[in-house]
């Protein structure tokens, strides 16, 4: 099995004082735990804090982000960004394609509509072994990658003066 490629791009990862939302789908619990460990470590390295919300599956992630970010904004403490974590493993039916495409589409629409720095860490794989390799913080670290993407977008928005 090929080792997933790692991004070598150095991006701004100083999010000191920023508070991020992590929404995780724990349908595959052990994979979810690895994704979460990577995301939490990346946010810690960026000196950011986080709040965690868990949902049953990948399709519930976008609406959970919408609800939580709206609530935080109304409370006067908006999130600096969000990290979506989950896993969709191909099965024998068309369900995989629906969940993979619709969760990604909804996340992109949410991020663009609300100018929300968002890292998509929803794995879409053929096998559980592929998911484990990509989720493991010591190998693929896709949870960490998603958090680093959200932090980089937050830093970009901060530099552009686009934060509310």
Curated annotation (Swiss-Prot):
<dbReference type="GO" id="GO:0005829">
    <property type="term" value="C:cytosol"/>
</dbReference>
<feature type="binding site">
    <location>
        <position position="134"/>
    </location>
    <ligand>
        <name>(2S)-2-hydroxy-3-oxobutyl phosphate</name>
    </ligand>
</feature>
<feature type="binding site">
    <location>
        <position position="120"/>
    </location>
    <ligand>
        <name>5-amino-6-(D-ribitylamino)uracil</name>
    </ligand>
</feature>
<dbReference type="GO" id="GO:0009349">
    <property type="term" value="C:riboflavin synthase complex"/>
</dbReference>
<feature type="active site" description="Proton donor">
    <location>
        <position position="95"/>
    </location>
</feature>
<comment type="similarity">
    <text>Belongs to the DMRL synthase family.</text>
</comment>
<keyword id="KW-0808">Transferase</keyword>
<keyword id="KW-0686">Riboflavin biosynthesis</keyword>
<dbReference type="GO" id="GO:0000906">
    <property type="term" value="F:6,7-dimethyl-8-ribityllumazine synthase activity"/>
</dbReference>
<feature type="binding site">
    <location>
        <begin position="92"/>
        <end position="93"/>
    </location>
    <ligand>
        <name>(2S)-2-hydroxy-3-oxobutyl phosphate</name>
    </ligand>
</feature>
<dbReference type="InterPro" id="IPR002180">
    <property type="entry name" value="LS/RS"/>
</dbReference>
<dbReference type="GO" id="GO:0009231">
    <property type="term" value="P:riboflavin biosynthetic process"/>
</dbReference>
<feature type="binding site">
    <location>
        <begin position="87"/>
        <end position="89"/>
    </location>
    <ligand>
        <name>5-amino-6-(D-ribitylamino)uracil</name>
    </ligand>
</feature>
<feature type="binding site">
    <location>
        <begin position="58"/>
        <end position="60"/>
    </location>
    <ligand>
        <name>5-amino-6-(D-ribitylamino)uracil</name>
    </ligand>
</feature>
<comment type="pathway">
    <text>Cofactor biosynthesis; riboflavin biosynthesis; riboflavin from 2-hydroxy-3-oxobutyl phosphate and 5-amino-6-(D-ribitylamino)uracil: step 1/2.</text>
</comment>
<dbReference type="InterPro" id="IPR034964">
    <property type="entry name" value="LS"/>
</dbReference>
<dbReference type="InterPro" id="IPR036467">
    <property type="entry name" value="LS/RS_sf"/>
</dbReference>
<feature type="binding site">
    <location>
        <position position="27"/>
    </location>
    <ligand>
        <name>5-amino-6-(D-ribitylamino)uracil</name>
    </ligand>
</feature>
<dbReference type="Pfam" id="PF00885">
    <property type="entry name" value="DMRL_synthase"/>
</dbReference>
<protein>
    <recommendedName>
        <fullName>6,7-dimethyl-8-ribityllumazine synthase</fullName>
        <ecNumber>2.5.1.78</ecNumber>
    </recommendedName>
</protein>
<comment type="function">
    <text>Catalyzes the formation of 6,7-dimethyl-8-ribityllumazine by condensation of 5-amino-6-(D-ribitylamino)uracil with 3,4-dihydroxy-2-butanone 4-phosphate. This is the penultimate step in the biosynthesis of riboflavin.</text>
</comment>
